[in-house]
Amino acid sequence: MKLATAFTILTAVLAAPLAAPAPAPDAAPAAVPEGPAAAAYSSILSVVAKQSKKFKHHKRDLDEKDQFIVVFDSSATVDQIASEIQKLDSLVDEDSSNGITSALDLPVYTDGSGFLGFVGKFNSTIVDKLKESSVLTVEPDTIVSLPEIPASSNAKRAIQTTPVTQWGLSRISHKKAQTGNYAYVRETVGKHPTVSYVVDSGIRTTHSEFGGRAVWGANFADTQNADLLGHGTHVAGTVGGKTYGVDANTKLVAVKVFAGRSAALSVINQGFTWALNDYISKRDTLPRGVLNFSGGGPKSASQDALWSRATQEGLLVAIAAGNDAVDACNDSPGNIGGSTSGIITVGSIDSSDKISVWSGGQGSNYGTCVDVFAPGSDIISASYQSDSGTLVYSGTSMACPHVAGLASYYLSINDEVLTPAQVEALITESNTGVLPTTNLKGSPNAVAYNGVGI
């Protein structure tokens, strides 16, 4: 089984088998099918409920080889999906260990148009039959590892300038890198509320950096609504902490998909699907949203298809490019950044505007799938160990939330609800040609910028 790396600096370690996930707080209720496709959608939900029941208390072992992710093409109709599900049901013996374990569904769409796919345990015969379909993609579940270790031990626009110790905030608010006397320059207060989903290891919501703006959304990793690793809390602090965050006004929603250093891709996809459904269900009153995922894994057509749905719904996605010092086009979902408007793949630079290089041959990924670079070396942010502590980490995991926070900031200061593509253009096209050209290796010469400081 291939291991994937998510993007702070360390080597990958496999976690123990995942415990059964806790129920997702505030999760959307089961869909009540409505509309012309109601019968087809109802039949889909019926099969999913029947097959998944046998796995209710199943603990996912990361070494299992027979788990698969199935994602339907965006062109597939609800009737076509229902037909494929019925075919699958005819192949699954009720007493066997085969079957759908969970759905990848957006139940806010009660006509079934949000049924994106499913995860299941299937033998080779069933997998071969599934692959005969022209309207779906079938792939083995893979492992995404989350290395998480400190990199070091320790009208008229109303403009606000704040002295900061965090060089990253200074960099994204100036055209050129500053040398000391760092200051974060931005518009004083966003006029419109935003929501930022952090799909990660959870958030220490009680940390003083968050001022009550961080909440638990869903937990697909274990039964503890706590960040036991620190990765998610650090990321959230960069997105929206009051001292170290880009947008200190955004609401932060924790979507936990990592309990240990590793998680199944299927679990990450479930977290993503929950976040997208939650955003859609609240979009009428809170339309300005972003999602941060500081991780990735081997190329996955099913994941790429699934995550592309976010921008169609109006949710901007920021993704870390990776720390392997290789072409970012080799990882998912970061490989879709360069070609999908509204999904931003983020590389890392250091305080001297050089593409980040770390010990052990690690460095920021690069190439045409990278959309923009942002500060990722020696970043100070919130610690998971106390309600007031800080930690210093490095990686594209740290660059990514600078961009997610910047996207939230742009959404908050504009009266018009900008599309993900419009926000991406503001971030990636406002500060170009400023990096040394020697090691770009096909990457864009662009640094994330808020358009304020000179």
Swiss-Prot record:
Q: Which gene encodes it?
A: XPR2
- What does the entry report about post-translational modification of this chain? The pro-region is removed through cleavage by XPR6 after Lys156-Arg157, which yields mature active XPR2.
Enzyme Commission numbers on file: 3.4.21.62
> Which compartments is it annotated to reside in?
Secreted
What does the similarity note say?
Answer: Belongs to the peptidase S8 family.
Q: What class of enzyme is it?
A: hydrolase
Q: Per the UniProt entry, how does temperature affect activity?
A: Optimum temperature is 40 degrees Celsius.
Instruction: Give the regulation of activity.
Output: The protease activity is completely inhibited by the serine inhibitor PMSF but is not affected by thiol group inhibitors and in the presence of dithiothreitol. In the presence of high concentrations of o-phenanthroline the protease activity is only partially inhibited. The pro-region plays an inhibitory role and may provide a mechanism for preventing premature activation in the secretory pathway.
Signal peptide boundaries: 1-15
Q: What is this protein called?
A: Alkaline extracellular protease
Supply the CDD domains for this chain.
Peptidases_S8_PCSK9_ProteinaseK_like
UniProt KW Protease keyword = yes
Q: Which GO terms describe its cellular component?
A: extracellular space
PANTHER family noted in UniProt: CEREVISIN-RELATED (PTHR43806:SF11), PEPTIDASE S8 (PTHR43806)
Q: How does activity depend on pH?
A: Optimum pH is 9.0-10.0.
MF annotations from Gene Ontology: serine-type endopeptidase activity
Q: Name one GO biological process term.
A: proteolysis
* Extra remark beyond the main annotation: The pro-region inhibits protease activity and plays an additional essential role in the proper folding of the protein into a conformation compatible with secretion. Its complex processing and high level of secretion make XPR2 the perfect model to study the secretion pathway.
Q: Would you list which residues are glycosylated?
A: 123
